[in-house]
Design a protein with these regions (language model features):
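Acidic/histidine-rich catalytic cores of soluble enzymes
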Residues: 48-49, 139-199
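N-terminal pre-domain/capping segments
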Residues: 1-109, 139, 146, 150, ...
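Charged helix-capping and loop-helix junction motifs
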Residues: 62-68, 92-100, 127-138, 165-166, ...
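Active-site-proximal loop/turn and secondary-structure-junction residues that shape catalytic pockets
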Residues: 9-11, 53-55, 83-86, 118-122, ...
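Conserved short-loop catalytic and cofactor-binding motifs
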Residues: 25, 54, 90, 129, ...
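Gly/Pro-rich active-site loop or hairpin
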Residues: 13, 17-32, 125, 165, ...
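Active-site groove signature of glycoside hydrolases
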Residues: 106-128, 151-157
Length: 199
């Protein structure tokens, strides 16, 4: 088993400003010094990391900078976490542009797992058919990740369609995507993590 450390514990989580007016430019970003964070993580014995998409795509103009940084500390980037709404059909095309850009960058630096969060909750709440829209969006995302040799997996997340046990079960009944079980999110959403993993 490979165990990694998520770098988002090292700073505030924000969204890239471009995403406010352009869906394809939305990103999660951890406000941290990436190299200092990598140094701290490897010092305590972890050799694999997961980052948020913005901390990966920040290096899109020169991926070698990130590749060299990982090599300097004898580390690898095992996964990247991305987010999307998936249920708004007029935005889905641009969300796939976003996911493709992240997948392309991930492949360049040797990432294996493409961890997906999402499934927006509408202002009027989860509506009939929303879970199916999420599942269809995830299918499109899986097609993209397969092109780049990445393994797509879904991370049930607080504040999304897949937060509560019945919501999570409904999604995985509608989708064959692999799972990334975040124990804290599962527990906070009311799902016993061990029960979920055994399923």
């Amino acid at each position: 088993m490979k165990i990694g450390y998520m770098t988002n514990a090292f700073g505030p989580l924000v969204g890239a400003g471009g995403g406010v007016t352009s869906v394809k430019d939305i990103r999660y970003v951890t406000m941290t010094d990436d190299e200092a964070t990598l140094e701290q993580i490897t010092k305590i014995g972890f050799k694999s990391i997961e980052v948020l998409e913005g901390n990966l795509t920040n290096y899109a103009d020169d991926p070698q900078v990130l590749i060299d940084m990982l090599a300097k500390y004898g580390a690898d980037m095992m996964s990247v976490c991305v987010g999307a709404n998936f249920i708004y059909q007029d935005a889905l095309e641009d969300e796939m542009v976003h996911l493709r850009a992240v997948a392309e960058m991930a492949a360049k630096v040797g990432v294996k797992y493409f961890v997906i969060c999402g499934g927006a909750i509408r202002g009027k709440g989860i509506q009939p058919g929303d879970v199916e829209l999420l599942a269809k969006g995830l299918s499109k995302a899986m097609e993209i990740t397969e092109e780049y040799g990445l393994v797509a997996c879904f991370h049930p997340h607080l504040g999304s369609i897949a937060e509560k046990p019945e919501e999570i079960d409904a999604l995985f009944a509608a989708s064959d995507i692999k799972v990334c079980p975040d124990l804290a999110h599962l527990k906070a959403g009311g799902y016993d993590p061990l029960t979920f993993i055994k399923k």
